[in-house]
Curated annotation (Swiss-Prot):
Organism: Xenopus laevis (African clawed frog)
GO biological process, one term: UDP-N-acetylglucosamine transmembrane transport
Alphabetized UniProt keyword annotations: Golgi apparatus, Membrane, Transmembrane, Transmembrane helix
Disulfide bond sites: none
Record-given protein name: UDP-N-acetylglucosamine transporter TMEM241 homolog
Function: Golgi-localized UDP-N-acetylglucosamine (UDP-GlcNAc) transporter that transports UDP-N-acetylglucosamine into Golgi lumen.
PANTHER family listed in its UniProt record: SOLUTE CARRIER FAMILY 35
Principal place of residence: Golgi
Family: Belongs to the nucleotide-sugar transporter family. SLC35A subfamily.
GO molecular function: UDP-N-acetylglucosamine transmembrane transporter activity
Matching InterPro entries: TPT_transporter
Domain of life: Eukaryota
GO CC annotation terms, alphabetical: Golgi apparatus; membrane
Gene this chain is encoded by: tmem241
Length: 296
């Protein structure tokens, strides 16, 4: 694997770890399980910071083309599906289990790419897809903390992630940059999640949240919004400064560090079969990075 750009890569890993730990703390420890509000808040904070950075000239955003914005709206809908379903899944599943299921999104994107773009894949990538599918498929059979709702939302999440990757790849010819797309995602998410907060019952239920006036909740929510934006920005910088293979390598490292440390800080019941499933998922992603690098 290539790990050039250590400063950018390590910064990305730090924000990745901090963001997931903060989200897990708010969702699972404090049990603030109202995704329209939590994700709406995160996208609002991210959108405001991104807008301010744009206005003061720190970042460049160009969303003047209405046709490009309209063409990107399906991506916005998939983005909302990713963060909403991901929030509900992460609140119920341990981080290593969530990552293993999340990685299975490669199976979805691989299927669509074969169907739509007729892409030929090297045998090593096919093997990695097999490992990712096998590990994700065996997880519910060997998870002593099996949660049906958590797995259901994880499946929705991974499907949206896979479709988002394919859709993003199909829009490469457009004039929207990664930051442009993310800015539109933020605006769309704030509006849609805000409108959905009352019909889903989250707005009323949140008024009875036991930690509503506690500083731990306030600081956790503020940190989650800021860290989410910083993680997004670090990811964009990583993609722009390094190759796609190097970006995938750092993403893999960030997941390994986050999943490993989560075993210390968050509750998880590890058994031998579950551990083998998690290791198979990690091996599958490592082989996928290797396949992207070598092309064989």
């Amino acid at each position: 694997m290539y790990f050039r750009g250590p400063a950018v890569g390590l910064t990305f890993c730090c924000f990745y770890l901090s963001s997931y730990f903060t989200n897990k703390y708010v969702l699972s420890v404090l049990k603030f399980t109202y995704p329209t509000l939590f994700q709406g808040w995160q996208t609002l904070v991210g959108g405001l910071i991104l807008h301010i950075c744009w206005k003061v000239g720190w970042l460049e955003i160009n969303c003047n083309s209405r046709s490009d914005v309209v063409l990107w709206l399906p991506g916005c809908a998939l983005f909302v599906g990713i963060i909403y379903a991901g929030s509900r899944a992460l609140s119920r599943l341990p981080i290593p289990v969530f990552f293993t299921l999340h990685n299975a999104a490669e199976v979805v994107s691989y299927g669509f790419q074969r169907l739509l773009f007729r892409e030929k894949c090297p045998y090593s990538k096919i093997f990695s897809i097999f490992l990712l599918l096998l590990s994700a498929g065996c997880l519910p059979l060997h998870d002593p903390q099996f949660d049906a709702d958590g797995y259901f939302w994880a499946v929705i999440h991974l499907f949206c992630v896979g479709c988002y990757k394919v859709f993003k790849k199909s829009q490469k010819s457009g004039s929207l940059s990664d930051l442009d797309q993310q800015y539109i995602n933020y605006v769309f998410s704030v509006v849609l999640l805000g409108l959905a907060s009352h019909p889903t019952g989250d707005l009323i239920s949140a008024l009875e949240f036991p930690f509503l006036y506690f500083y731990r909740f306030h600081s956790g929510c503020c940190a989650s919004g800021i860290l989410g934006f910083l993680l997004m920005l670090a990811s964009v910088k990583l993609r722009s400064n390094l190759s796609s293979v190097q970006h995938a390598s750092w993403n893999f490292v960030a997941k390994v560090i986050t999943a490993g440390l989560s075993l210390i800080y968050f509750q998880i019941t590890l058994t031998v079969p579950l551990t083998l499933c998690l290791l198979a998922g990690g091996l599958g992603e490592a082989v996928l990075v290797y396949a992207e690098r070598t092309g064989v």
